[in-house]
């Protein structure tokens, strides 16, 4: 593999109610990504707790610390970097929705906090404007979390100034049910516009299912890779759990892709065809 090629694993993992199960899924995906030669495993928003009505039960410091330790240990054991979503805890019981960058030695390099919260999230979490650009694997990585894609006026000036090579977009996104359907969905079109304006690639890492309202799962998943030109390079399967291992050249053009479906528990199937069906 050329030194200019970055092999990423986009981990569109099935969301579970229990943090232990989500963490097992994350660690299994990290192991798979390493086995396939990926440099980094990318995981969704609140990877370890999930996004559901039991979040208050899961978002406990001792539990989250243990789950995050397990992910860091998996990175160190398999010599692979990862980005993972987990709450962070501040003074006075303050909680943030955060995204953590971990290197191939298991060290925590940086943490990004979500600023643009939904109304339900704001009843439990606190917004925080911590959005560093992280140098890792020869690239500069930016982050926006889930519905922050709607905050274009705040994001675009920052990304233009910070000039990240890639922006990670972990979330639990789906089309607005009250609006006409578009192809690609409106939230993806907004990301394409942001990529063009800021000359950055964007990698979406989306949950493929919804737990509070299972009927919404039909429109979940479909994570995307968007090039600096705004071109939609790759779309993962709709409403399917699995891991996509993708080679990107220095110009953010996919050179190779493979799909591994997630089966029962934390098991993944063999390499499947691309594009996956």
Segments from the language model and where they lie:
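Extreme N-terminal starter segment of soluble prokaryotic enzymes
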Residues: 3-9
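Short amphipathic alpha-helices and their capping/turn segments at secondary-structure boundaries
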Residues: 24-38, 153-162
């Amino acid at each position: 593999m050329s030194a200019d090629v970055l092999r990423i694993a986009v981990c569109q993992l099935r969301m579970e109610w229990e943090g232990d199960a989500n963490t097992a899924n994350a660690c299994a995906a990290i192991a798979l990504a390493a086995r396939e030669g990926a440099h980094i495993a990318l995981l969704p928003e609140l990877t370890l707790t999930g996004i559901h009505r039991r979040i208050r039960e899961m978002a406990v410091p001792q539990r989250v610390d243990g789950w995050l330790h397990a992910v860091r240990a998996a990175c160190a054991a398999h010599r692979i970097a990862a980005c993972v979503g987990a709450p962070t805890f501040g003074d006075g019981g303050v909680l943030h929705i955060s995204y953590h960058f971990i290197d191939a030695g298991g060290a925590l390099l940086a943490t990004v906090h979500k600023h643009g919260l939904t109304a339900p999230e704001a009843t439990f979490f606190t917004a925080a404007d911590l959005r560093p650009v992280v140098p890792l694997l020869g690239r500069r990585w930016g982050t926006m979390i889930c519905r922050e894609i709607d905050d274009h006026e705040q994001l675009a000036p920052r990304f233009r100034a910070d000039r990240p090579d890639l922006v990670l977009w972990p979330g639990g996104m789906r089309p607005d049910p009250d609006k006409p359907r578009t192809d690609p969905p409106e939230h993806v079109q907004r990301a394409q516009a942001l990529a063009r304006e800021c000359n950055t690639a964007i990698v979406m890492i989306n949950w493929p299912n919804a737990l509070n309202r299972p009927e919404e799962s039909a429109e979940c998943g479909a994570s995307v890779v968007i090039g600096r030109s705004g071109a939609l390079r790759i779309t993962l399967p709709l409403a399917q759990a699995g891991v996509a291992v993708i080679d990107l050249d220095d110009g953010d053009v996919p050179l190779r892709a493979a799909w591994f479906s997630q089966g029962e528990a934390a098991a993944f199937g063999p390499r499947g065809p691309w594009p996956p069906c």
